[in-house]
């Protein structure tokens, strides 16, 4: 089967690249259809994929039944997971589903081992301050969907996101000292952070 494409899947490779070589244990938060978790499982021995949506998680489990992934149906905010238990925590297009972004970022950061990596691709609410970026992203995404053929994921859609780019930056600065925030094509934002040793 050909690799499906949409603007979310486009960033799976970027998130994979953010996970350092030698990583042993990774958590995929809001794994949805499981494509990122399956990609990571090709090179990382212990992958845990968590999603709150049971039907979506079942489809991911079925699709990647042979992948060495621990599938977990849970709310990331209340799931029983070890603090500082993962060398890397990744999330693609899921953070904006959690209304309290500040608490969610704190939770995700707390799951990363000292020296480990947090890498999140998320959406932000369009704003006048970033209007040109949002407009060009929307146009680029529409063109890419027509050229590449957009694969429709089965996960729920949440729009609009709960925060603007300015608000997200404020939360990240307060909770994840030294984190990097980058605007990406297709209207996404990348947050990367290395947990202090």
From Swiss-Prot:
EC number: 2.1.1.-
Cited CDD domains: AdoMet_MTases
UniProt xrefs under InterPro entries: Methyltransf_11, SAM-dependent_MTases_sf
Chaperone among keywords: no
A Gene Ontology BP annotation from the UniProt entry: methylation
Family as reported in the entry's similarity comment: Belongs to the methyltransferase superfamily.
A GO term for molecular function: S-adenosylmethionine-dependent methyltransferase activity
Keyword Transferase attached: yes
Protein's recorded name: Uncharacterized methyltransferase Rv0089
Enzyme class: transferase
UniProt keyword annotations, A-Z: Methyltransferase, Transferase
GO CC annotation: peptidoglycan-based cell wall
Record Gene3D superfamilies: Vaccinia Virus protein VP39
Stretches that traverse the bilayer: none
One Pfam family here: Methyltransf_11
Highest rank taxon of the organism: Bacteria
